Amino acid sequence: MWQFPALLFLFLPGCCTAQDPVTGPEEVSGQEQGSLTVQCRYDSGWKDYKKYWCRGAYWKSCEILVETDASEQLVKENRVSIRDDQTDFIFTVTMEDLRMSDADIYWCGITKAGTDPMFKVNVNIDPEISTTIMTTTATVLPSTVLTSTVLTSTVLTPTTPTTESIGTENIGQVTQNSLFIWSLLSSISFLLMVFVVVPLLLSMLSAVLWVNRPQRHYGGGEIGLVETHRSDALDGEKHFPGDEK
């Protein structure tokens, strides 16, 4: 009573039994932009027949993508190639430059009169793994340019870099920024000395020289006193006639 269903099962395409003219993997996977290879094995009696690789869910209406010429010559159509090894009775199908749309049901087949021996293969395509490259950029504060002689007081608040935001390559940049700040402070100190300290010293020196300058005496009072004494002396030397008596 069960013999007829069992015999019918043996002739269904895609089943993996010893009586199948052609067999292969039931499922294969490939990665997007990559390639995959499918090996289909056949009985020695099918050595001189054409082998093919077709696509479609229904075996009777699948689209043949590539087919051999009954020899061992490699045949390639677009992104699919096939080669028949008639010594080991294996034909190999290679799909290159895989796309997500390539995921479908395919068939290993042998061309013959009547119904072709076929084997069903389910092809899965995995998405391409993208690699993200992380880059670290350092932000450099613009330099301050002094364009005027007017001095202004500037408060510099240094920021402490953290190890998370500054890597090994940024340490040199931080050192350069520190040297620039030190150079800027030195320039401000020099300008203070030139425009404040030096004029102040010159003013003090001028004041000292002014105080210690030589004093010239025009002596109006002294000259008058000398002249008075001289007049008295001359009057004493005069002789009057009454004095001789």
From Swiss-Prot:
Any single GO BP term: positive regulation of protein ubiquitination
Subcellular location: Cell membrane; Early endosome; Lysosome
Start and end residues of each stretch annotated as Important for maintaining surface expression and for interaction with FCER1G: 177-182, 189-198
Membrane topology recorded in Swiss-Prot or TrEMBL: Single-pass type I membrane protein
GO CC annotations, alphabetized: early endosome; endosome; lysosome; plasma membrane
Main location: membrane
Signal peptide per UniProt: 1-18
Residues covered by the Ig-like V-type domain: 19-124
Induction remark: Down-regulated in macrophages by single-stranded CpG oligodeoxynucleotide stimulation.
Cytoplasmic side: 211-245
SS bond partners: C40-C108
Keywords, alphabetical: Cell membrane, Disulfide bond, Endosome, Immunity, Immunoglobulin domain, Lysosome, Membrane, Receptor, Signal, Transmembrane, Transmembrane helix
Keyword Cell membrane recorded: yes
SUPFAM superfamilies listed in its UniProt record: Immunoglobulin
Ranges facing Extracellular side: 19-189
Transmembrane segments: 190-210
PANTHER family: CMRF35-LIKE MOLECULE 1, POLYMERIC-IMMUNOGLOBULIN RECEPTOR
Family: Belongs to the CD300 family.
Cited function: Acts as an activating receptor inducing cytokine production in mast cells. Can act as a positive regulator of TLR9 signaling in macrophages, leading to enhanced production of pro-inflammatory cytokines.
Protein name stated in the entry: CMRF35-like molecule 3
Recorded name of the encoding gene: Cd300ld3
